[in-house]
Amino acid sequence: IRSVVEAVLPDNNSSLMEKIFTQRKLGRGPAITVIGGGTGLSTLLRGMKYITSNCNAVVTVADDGGSSGRLRKEMGIIPPGDLRNCLVALADREPLMERIMQFRFNDGSPLAGHNFGNLFIAAMAEAEGSMEAGLAATSQILNVRGKVIPSTLSDIRLKAEMTDGTLIEGESEIPKAHKRIRRVGIEPSNVQATSSAVDAIMKAD
């Protein structure tokens, strides 16, 4: 097949040919599902997208600080920050998309502190009727290799019990205590995972 394409396409379309074969190769890659959040998961995904396009990222949604925390309170949506980082990491046009999606508005603006990518995802979720549909639409726009899936659509909060018995709630508040952590959990503790997250885990190689 490759020799036929090389004969048909002019020389200046060689990059297109390489892209076609790269997509075919990645499409035959293993089905991998990774679970996490923060910068660690997005860093892992940047490398994985060159191995397979059958990659699912199940992302935690307990962030309550910064732009994500504000949107969570004001719009009643799950925090988009970690979801955004994973979308950017898996985007086929990563350098350009990263500059746009990671842009943060400066002080002096009504949007100061907000991240453009967070606002974009929030807008897509509202336009498409749900966060999952909004993420799917955003993935198409960014030409994402794989899927980014929220672990739950419930309003969850991270909580921690310190070694001195202190209980602290909120991901952004826990580090401020400067105390040793005995155990961590979520509130409420019986939230339901998204069906797409469960499906991705069950179908992974």
Language-model features: locations:
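Short N-terminal binding/cap micro-motifs at the start of the first secondary-structure element
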Residues: 40-44, 65-68
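Glycine-rich nucleotide/cofactor/substrate-binding loop typically near the N-terminus or early
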Residues: 59-132, 137-142, 147
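Short glycine/serine/threonine-biased micro-segments
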Residues: 34-36, 115
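Short coil/turn residues that cap or connect secondary-structure elements
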Residues: 36-37, 79
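A glycine- and small-aliphatic-rich helix-loop capping segment at beta-alpha/alpha-beta transitions
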Residues: 47-54, 74-78
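Gly/serine-rich nucleotide phosphate-binding loop at the start of the catalytic core
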Residues: 35, 49-50, 57-62
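Conserved catalytic alpha/beta core of Sir2/sirtuin-type deacylases, generalized to analogous enzyme cores
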Residues: 1-31, 39, 43, 52-57, ...
